[in-house]
């Protein structure tokens, strides 16, 4: 990639720019994570919460930029998203005794994810929790109630708003050996294993570097086994509809294209892209996953930050896909050759 990148870029596939899907985290790597969640404890008392001990594992080649280099894994945004939602769901299921149908109809309204000050690279025996911050009645919500949770996995944090029914109110504490013991088999739940059973083709990519925008057409394919993913939180909605995970991972690939074009670098020469904050909001009716969906990304601000002897590119982003909107901020350290020619406000 030269530093005199064209203002307009048209690609038949995002792979033409970022490389094969099976070597990249946001296309395939996130689906290769394995989770072990143990010692799940629900305490509905004065400080209502659910706690657990979590270990994660990734294969060595979970993401590659150069043929001979395996990147070091850490707790990812997708990991935080799905683990925190399952902990929150476990609290609701235990405390309100939600039945199978009520769990399927419960819906995620909003997700806010924040990174820690350092990446969480220790993946064994992590402390994790979701704390209930409040429940309010809402006649527009599925089930008539909205509960807000804050959660953490290691140093990463999140906030969730979940629509649900509340047929009962149980005050007894609960102890479970695993999440499956509370929620049922992970293979039948989208936020358990189901999110791994979709893959995306991102085509007709159009990036306007001057305007800091990119669009694409996203085609989603369900992998064998997805037809059984009908249980748990968002089960009714995601059996056929697009998800917040779909919105995040597809738009992140467009963000990468814009970022690399902005400073004239290639993926193989780039440094790790760090998420600082992401907000995903359900804003409309479900978009059927079987139908192509339009993805749209726009940088709402961008600047340069001298830090630890290097130069970092920071951006804030607005994006959307299939009934979800996303606002987020990301940063990466520019390689030396790109930093020498980087253009923009420095703070």
Task: Label every PLM stretch briefly.
Residues 27, 32, 36-44, 50, ...:
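Hydrophobic, glycine-enriched assembly/anchoring segments
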Residues 1-19, 125, 129-192, 294-347:
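HotDog/MaoC-like acyl-thioester-processing domains
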Residues 80, 109-111, 149, 250, ...:
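One face of beta-strands
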Residues 88-133, 257-302:
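Hydrophobic beta-strand-centered segment that forms part of the acyl-chain substrate-binding groove
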Residues 74, 121-123, 139-144, 241-245, ...:
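Short, low-complexity cationic-aromatic patches
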